[in-house]
Curated annotation (Swiss-Prot):
Gene it is expressed from: guaAA
Protein name per Swiss-Prot or TrEMBL: GMP synthase [glutamine-hydrolyzing] subunit A
Organism: Methanococcus vannielii (strain ATCC 35089 / DSM 1224 / JCM 13029 / OCM 148 / SB)
Enzyme Commission identifier(s): 6.3.5.2
Signal sequence region: none
Reactions it catalyzes: XMP + L-glutamine + ATP + H2O = GMP + L-glutamate + AMP + diphosphate + 2 H(+)
UniProtKB keywords: ATP-binding, Glutamine amidotransferase, GMP biosynthesis, Ligase, Nucleotide-binding, Purine biosynthesis
GO molecular function: ATP binding; GMP synthase activity
Gene Ontology cellular-component annotations: cytosol
Purpose of the protein: Catalyzes the synthesis of GMP from XMP.
Domain Glutamine amidotransferase type-1: 1-189
Amino acid sequence: MIVILNNGGQYVHRIQRSLKYIGVPAKIVLNSTNLEEIEKNPEIKGIILSGGPDITKATNCENIALNSKLPVLGICLGHQLISKAYGGKVKRAESEEYASIKIHVKYENDIFKNVPNEFTAWASHMDEVKEIPDCLEVLAFSEICGVEAFKHKEKLVYGVQFHPEVSHTEHGELILKNFCKVCGFKFNE
Protein backbone atom coordinates (compact mmCIF):
# COMPACT_ATOMS: atom_id res chain seq x y z
CA MET A 1 0.00 0.00 0.00
CA ILE A 2 1.00 3.60 -0.64
CA VAL A 3 -0.02 6.16 1.96
CA ILE A 4 -0.89 9.65 0.67
CA LEU A 5 -0.50 12.55 3.08
CA ASN A 6 -3.32 14.98 2.37
CA ASN A 7 -2.04 18.56 2.25
CA GLY A 8 -5.44 19.88 1.18
CA GLY A 9 -4.79 19.84 -2.56
CA GLN A 10 -7.56 19.48 -5.10
CA TYR A 11 -5.98 16.37 -6.66
CA VAL A 12 -5.41 14.18 -3.58
CA HIS A 13 -8.28 11.82 -4.44
CA ARG A 14 -7.09 11.77 -8.04
CA ILE A 15 -3.70 10.46 -6.82
CA GLN A 16 -5.44 7.65 -4.95
CA ARG A 17 -7.62 6.80 -7.95
CA SER A 18 -4.64 6.82 -10.33
CA LEU A 19 -2.83 4.35 -8.08
CA LYS A 20 -5.95 2.16 -7.93
CA TYR A 21 -6.10 2.13 -11.76
CA ILE A 22 -2.59 0.65 -11.91
CA GLY A 23 -3.41 -1.92 -9.23
CA VAL A 24 -1.70 -0.29 -6.25
CA PRO A 25 -3.71 0.06 -3.04
CA ALA A 26 -3.54 3.53 -1.50
CA LYS A 27 -4.90 5.26 1.57
CA ILE A 28 -5.30 9.00 2.17
CA VAL A 29 -4.31 10.16 5.67
CA LEU A 30 -4.04 13.51 7.42
CA ASN A 31 -0.78 15.37 6.82
CA SER A 32 -0.26 15.36 10.59
CA THR A 33 -0.01 11.55 10.67
CA ASN A 34 3.04 10.44 12.65
CA LEU A 35 5.90 8.84 10.67
CA GLU A 36 6.33 6.08 13.26
CA GLU A 37 2.65 5.18 12.86
CA ILE A 38 3.12 4.92 9.09
CA GLU A 39 6.33 2.89 9.26
CA LYS A 40 5.03 0.37 11.81
CA ASN A 41 2.37 -0.80 9.31
CA PRO A 42 4.08 -3.56 7.26
CA GLU A 43 1.58 -3.12 4.40
CA ILE A 44 2.83 0.40 3.65
CA LYS A 45 5.63 0.39 1.06
CA GLY A 46 5.84 4.09 0.15
CA ILE A 47 4.63 7.60 0.92
CA ILE A 48 3.28 10.34 -1.36
CA LEU A 49 3.15 13.93 -0.12
CA SER A 50 0.25 15.56 -1.97
CA GLY A 51 -0.14 19.06 -3.27
CA GLY A 52 -1.96 21.73 -1.33
CA PRO A 53 -2.49 25.45 -0.87
CA ASP A 54 -0.39 26.24 2.20
CA ILE A 55 3.21 25.27 2.89
CA THR A 56 2.94 26.47 6.51
CA LYS A 57 0.27 23.86 7.32
CA ALA A 58 2.31 20.89 6.13
CA THR A 59 5.47 20.99 8.24
CA ASN A 60 5.07 17.35 9.37
CA CYS A 61 5.77 16.40 5.76
CA GLU A 62 9.26 17.89 6.11
CA ASN A 63 9.96 15.49 9.00
CA ILE A 64 8.74 12.60 6.87
CA ALA A 65 10.92 13.67 3.93
CA LEU A 66 13.98 13.85 6.18
CA ASN A 67 13.46 10.70 8.24
CA SER A 68 11.39 8.17 6.31
CA LYS A 69 12.91 4.76 5.71
CA LEU A 70 10.26 4.24 3.02
CA PRO A 71 10.44 5.75 -0.49
CA VAL A 72 8.83 9.21 -0.69
CA LEU A 73 7.37 11.09 -3.67
CA GLY A 74 6.37 14.73 -3.29
CA ILE A 75 3.88 16.13 -5.80
CA CYS A 76 3.55 19.92 -6.26
CA LEU A 77 3.54 21.28 -2.67
CA GLY A 78 4.98 17.92 -1.55
CA HIS A 79 7.91 18.51 -3.93
CA GLN A 80 8.45 21.97 -2.43
CA LEU A 81 8.28 20.61 1.13
CA ILE A 82 10.96 18.00 0.42
CA SER A 83 13.31 20.60 -1.03
CA LYS A 84 12.66 22.97 1.89
CA ALA A 85 13.27 20.17 4.41
CA TYR A 86 16.75 19.58 3.01
CA GLY A 87 17.63 23.30 2.85
CA GLY A 88 16.27 24.33 -0.55
CA LYS A 89 14.58 27.65 -1.27
CA VAL A 90 10.90 27.86 -2.22
CA LYS A 91 9.64 31.20 -3.54
CA ARG A 92 6.89 32.72 -5.66
CA ALA A 93 7.12 31.55 -9.27
CA GLU A 94 8.04 34.21 -11.83
CA SER A 95 5.32 32.77 -14.03
CA GLU A 96 2.54 31.02 -12.14
CA GLU A 97 1.71 27.76 -13.85
CA TYR A 98 -1.93 26.76 -14.36
CA ALA A 99 -1.66 25.03 -17.69
CA SER A 100 0.01 22.33 -19.67
CA ILE A 101 3.76 22.75 -20.00
CA LYS A 102 6.63 20.94 -21.73
CA ILE A 103 8.82 18.99 -19.33
CA HIS A 104 12.43 18.29 -20.35
CA VAL A 105 13.96 15.23 -18.68
CA LYS A 106 17.69 15.58 -17.93
CA TYR A 107 18.15 12.13 -16.35
CA GLU A 108 15.95 9.07 -16.84
CA ASN A 109 16.75 7.93 -13.26
CA ASP A 110 14.09 5.76 -11.56
CA ILE A 111 10.81 7.69 -11.87
CA PHE A 112 11.49 8.71 -15.48
CA LYS A 113 12.47 5.23 -16.69
CA ASN A 114 11.09 4.77 -20.24
CA VAL A 115 9.60 8.29 -20.21
CA PRO A 116 10.50 10.40 -23.29
CA ASN A 117 13.01 13.23 -22.89
CA GLU A 118 10.19 15.70 -23.53
CA PHE A 119 6.52 15.41 -22.62
CA THR A 120 3.52 17.56 -21.76
CA ALA A 121 2.42 17.82 -18.13
CA TRP A 122 -0.23 19.67 -16.13
CA ALA A 123 1.06 22.25 -13.65
CA SER A 124 -0.93 24.16 -11.07
CA HIS A 125 1.12 26.22 -8.63
CA MET A 126 2.09 29.72 -7.53
CA ASP A 127 5.35 28.82 -5.74
CA GLU A 128 8.27 26.73 -6.91
CA VAL A 129 11.66 25.42 -5.85
CA LYS A 130 14.18 28.14 -6.74
CA GLU A 131 17.33 26.56 -5.25
CA ILE A 132 17.99 22.96 -4.32
CA PRO A 133 20.50 21.75 -1.75
CA ASP A 134 23.54 19.70 -2.75
CA CYS A 135 21.88 16.44 -1.66
CA LEU A 136 19.21 16.77 -4.39
CA GLU A 137 19.74 16.36 -8.13
CA VAL A 138 17.53 18.01 -10.77
CA LEU A 139 15.96 15.37 -13.01
CA ALA A 140 13.70 17.59 -15.14
CA PHE A 141 12.94 21.24 -15.93
CA SER A 142 10.59 23.37 -18.03
CA GLU A 143 11.04 26.69 -19.80
CA ILE A 144 9.58 28.52 -16.80
CA CYS A 145 10.66 26.31 -13.87
CA GLY A 146 14.22 25.12 -13.44
CA VAL A 147 13.32 22.34 -10.97
CA GLU A 148 10.32 20.37 -12.28
CA ALA A 149 11.65 17.14 -10.72
CA PHE A 150 14.47 16.00 -8.46
CA LYS A 151 15.87 12.97 -6.68
CA HIS A 152 17.79 12.73 -3.43
CA LYS A 153 21.32 11.53 -4.22
CA GLU A 154 21.40 8.90 -1.44
CA LYS A 155 17.78 8.18 -0.47
CA LEU A 156 14.68 7.04 -2.34
CA VAL A 157 13.15 10.52 -2.13
CA TYR A 158 11.72 12.20 -5.23
CA GLY A 159 9.79 15.35 -6.07
CA VAL A 160 7.79 16.50 -9.09
CA GLN A 161 6.38 20.02 -9.39
CA PHE A 162 3.81 18.96 -12.01
CA HIS A 163 0.86 16.57 -11.55
CA PRO A 164 1.48 13.02 -12.86
CA GLU A 165 -1.91 11.90 -11.52
CA VAL A 166 -4.03 13.90 -13.99
CA SER A 167 -4.92 12.74 -17.49
CA HIS A 168 -3.46 15.91 -19.07
CA THR A 169 0.04 14.74 -18.09
CA GLU A 170 1.53 12.49 -20.75
CA HIS A 171 3.18 9.41 -19.23
CA GLY A 172 1.88 10.37 -15.78
CA GLU A 173 0.67 6.82 -15.16
CA LEU A 174 4.15 5.52 -16.03
CA ILE A 175 5.80 8.01 -13.66
CA LEU A 176 3.53 6.83 -10.81
CA LYS A 177 4.12 3.21 -11.77
CA ASN A 178 7.89 3.79 -11.74
CA PHE A 179 7.65 5.24 -8.23
CA CYS A 180 5.61 2.21 -7.16
CA LYS A 181 8.33 -0.06 -8.60
CA VAL A 182 10.87 1.79 -6.44
CA CYS A 183 8.57 0.93 -3.50
CA GLY A 184 8.70 -2.77 -4.43
CA PHE A 185 5.47 -3.22 -6.38
CA LYS A 186 5.55 -5.59 -9.36
CA PHE A 187 3.53 -5.18 -12.55
CA ASN A 188 2.70 -7.59 -15.38
CA GLU A 189 4.06 -5.78 -18.40
